[in-house]
Amino acid sequence: FEVIEDVKNARSALGIIYFSRFNESVLSGVLAENHLLFTRLFTAAPHVFLSSGHPLAGKERVTLEELEEYPCLSYEQGEYNSFYFAEEILSTVKRRKQIRVSDRATLFNLLIGMNGYTICTGVISRELNGDSINSVPLSADEEIRIGYICRKGEPLGTLGERYLELMRRHIPQDDAIA
């Protein structure tokens, strides 16, 4: 929710969010109320990030059942913690072990140190993260539509355009919108 507020209040020129079957109608309404526009960048199937030493890291695909014994890591949602605004898809699935973190560095450290996992798009930058994190497809009947939001009728500006240009270098090109 904070990213929507930041863009609405012009603290940010753009923000990155995702739509899923679960959250699309709620988020679309919130964006319309706040005069914000969603532009899709790409669509992805759910993946999990695992440490390269995780027992499931070498599998071609994993299931939620296989992940059950490992801690699921997710981001704290701040003051507005409705599950419609969760940063991870499948956020309503009950998990035996759940750890909430506030930043990416902590999440990756716990992925490695505790054999945890997080559900994600599967997009990872090797130049930023090295080889310590693997992305493995998750067997789930879901899709994630990732895009950016901006204020309707306002240009992104030089910095916003440059950010999107750099971001597009790391997204799946077969599905990306140029």
Give the location of each predicted region.
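Alpha-helical segments flanking ligand/cofactor-binding loops in enzyme cores
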Residues: 4-5, 39, 65, 108-109, ...
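Secondary-structure junction motif
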Residues: 20, 24-25, 56-57, 64-93, ...
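Extended ligand-binding regions for polar small-molecule ligands
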Residues: 65, 145, 149-178
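Hydrophobic hinge/microswitch elements
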Residues: 2, 8-13, 18, 77-134
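N-terminal winged-helix
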Residues: 1-6, 155-158
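Beta-alpha-beta core module
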Residues: 26, 32-39, 44-45, 105-154
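Flexible hinge/capping segments at coil-to-helix
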Residues: 30-72
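Short helix-loop capping/hinge motifs at secondary-structure junctions, enriched
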Residues: 53-62, 140-142, 153-159
